[in-house]
């Protein structure tokens, strides 16, 4: 069993009308009631071959009643209906599964019925894929410029654009997200370009906070 995990919990607001916490780790997804920690649902089977080194870094992400679970070192995505899992449906709560897409380190972003996955594998580094959360189909992909830098930061959605930061601190802005085929609209380079920038950018009062290896930047228009 893979037991090492570097993840954050995901808080979802509507599991049987109650706030709940979803955690992915040790080859399982668990849903616990936020008020008292009571277990509401549990799903295993993410590591059927008992691989020893499938640590969890990328966190699950929720949108509505669907929670998306990246696993298998970036090789798989599993979408789960939270309500069905809380009803004890087990594997029948799985809406869809893909083994051709994933994210090992960056946590996907989600909203409006879609998930945005930043792939960080050797052959797919810098590929952004928009996935329909209901049926699991890819709606579009964008390849960021290839470089030696990988991707550890999680993407940020602000308005109709997405911000994706490389390990060298360079941030790409992609959009508009509701376009048939979004494009890179901006490339922002910082002076501290030493690897590794791993912190995710966050919005702050009409600006963007970016933590590189040595510096903290506040970026405004």
Protein language model regions, located:
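Noncatalytic, solvent-exposed loop/strand surfaces
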Residues: 1-221
């Amino acid at each position: 069993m893979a037991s090492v995990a570097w993840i954050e919990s995901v808080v979802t607001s509507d599991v049987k009308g109650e706030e709940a916490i979803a955690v992915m780790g040790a080859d399982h997804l668990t849903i616990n009631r936020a008020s008292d920690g009571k277990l509401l649902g549990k799903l295993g089977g993410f590591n059927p071959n008992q691989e020893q080194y499938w640590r969890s870094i990328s966190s699950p992400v929720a949108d509505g009643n669907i929670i998306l679970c990246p696993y298998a070192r970036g090789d798989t995505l599993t979408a789960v209906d939270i309500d069905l899992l809380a009803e004890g449906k087990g594997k029948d709560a799985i809406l869809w599964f893909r083994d051709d897409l994933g994210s090992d380190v960056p946590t996907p972003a989600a909203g409006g019925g879609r998930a945005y996955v930043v792939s960080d594998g050797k052959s797919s580094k810098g590929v952004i894929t928009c996935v329909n959360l209901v049926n699991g189909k890819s709606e579009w992909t964008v390849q960021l410029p290839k470089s030696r830098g990988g991707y550890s930061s999680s993407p940020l959605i602000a308005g109709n654009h997405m911000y994706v930061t490389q390990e060298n601190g360079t941030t790409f802005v992609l959009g508009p997200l509701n376009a048939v085929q979004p494009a890179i609209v901006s490339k922002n380079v910082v002076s501290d370009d030493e690897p590794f920038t791993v912190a995710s950018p966050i919005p702050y009062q009409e600006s963007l906070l970016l933590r590189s290896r040595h510096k903290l930047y506040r970026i405004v228009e």
